[in-house]
Amino acid sequence: FKGGGPYGQGVTRGQDLSGKDF
């Protein structure tokens, strides 16, 4: 996965740090 949550490109997981999918 490529980061796309509220933390931007730095989060490279299936979920962001809030636990939301992206």
UniProtKB/Swiss-Prot annotation:
Q: Where does the UniProt annotation locate this protein?
A: Plastid, Chloroplast thylakoid lumen
For the region Disordered, give the residue spans: 1-22
Q: Does the keyword Plastid apply?
A: yes
The positions making up the signal sequence are none
Q: Name one GO cellular component term.
A: chloroplast thylakoid lumen
- Give the family per the record: To A.thaliana At2g44920.
Name by which UniProt lists this protein = Thylakoid lumenal 11 kDa protein
What is the protein's species of origin? Spinacia oleracea (Spinach)
